[in-house]
Amino acid sequence: MSADENRAGILQAQYKNSIKKELVRKSIHICSALIPSFLTFAYWPVIACLTVVLVFYIASETLRKYGISVPVVSHITEVASRKRDENKFVLGPVTLVLGIIVTALLWKPEAARIGIYALAFGDGLASLGGKLFGRTVIPFTHGKTIAGSLTCFFAVLCSSFAVCKNGFVSLALALSAMAIELIPLGDFDNLVIPVAIGGLSTLLMR
């Protein structure tokens, strides 16, 4: 095998591994779309459960940093973590749960649902779409692609329209979510997107 073929094989393996990690990570994002339905039936118990999950994850991730593995949680974290998170505290799940909790506490149910859906589907599918189909990188966005941004736009457009049934509001929310997603916020987009989109939907639906 030539050096070029060997290098190509390594790159292909790295690409497949990154897609696998992205699928695991974004499947967790998408599952958060179930939370608004749970909140409808048991608001405070769900908030309490999310808080417990948040505290438990922080504790398990802290232990993992010190070489103590917590069954299931530490394994999922290692499987889903990005290369930039290796040997670091993986912050994504913390901001994900915080984003859901803060959105649910701040906004009325319909607006909170729209915000959480923007997180679950818009942000959840954007990076996956970018990795699978992204060819053109948008300047000054730390690697964000046109494909990823369009995925975010259409995901939020559809999910918000499913809730509010208003084309203008849905379009405004989708454009706003796409704009926020372009900002290189790192893991804090999990917090900013649902809170901001929930707040904007509150203003637009008055």
Positions of the model-derived regions?
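Hydrophobic alpha-helical transmembrane segments
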Residues: 1-140, 145-206
